[in-house]
């Protein structure tokens, strides 16, 4: 029965971790969209104050490949955690049914 309780606790922690990683994924997508928007705005020749302020914020090299790689890694991590979650959930159900019968 103690193994079942541990499996349930680990399953709950994995669910919380999946939620946090999905939040990280949304933040990465938002950051990628912001960089794309800044890059598009800075590509337009304009001498307005807004573009001048954005030029101060522009990094030397907008490397979108790094953000795409991190985004892919977070999605892969979510998939792996979901597989672990399903295995633990199956083990918990099997243990509970074994304890009942």
From Swiss-Prot:
Entry keyword set: Host membrane, Membrane, Signal, Transmembrane, Transmembrane helix
Any Pfam family: Corona_7
Topology in the lipid bilayer: Single-pass membrane protein
Protein name: Non-structural protein 7a
The keyword Membrane appears for this protein: yes
Major location (coarse): host cell
InterPro entries registered for this protein in UniProt: Corona_7 (IPR003449)
Cystine residue pairs: none
Family of this protein: Belongs to the coronaviruses ns7/ns7a protein family.
Localization: Host membrane
Cellular compartments per GO CC: host cell membrane; membrane
Free-text function comment from the UniProt entry: May function in the formation of membrane-bound replication complexes or in the assembly of the virus.
Signal peptide feature range: 1-43
Stretches that traverse the bilayer: 76-96
Superkingdom, natural source: Viruses
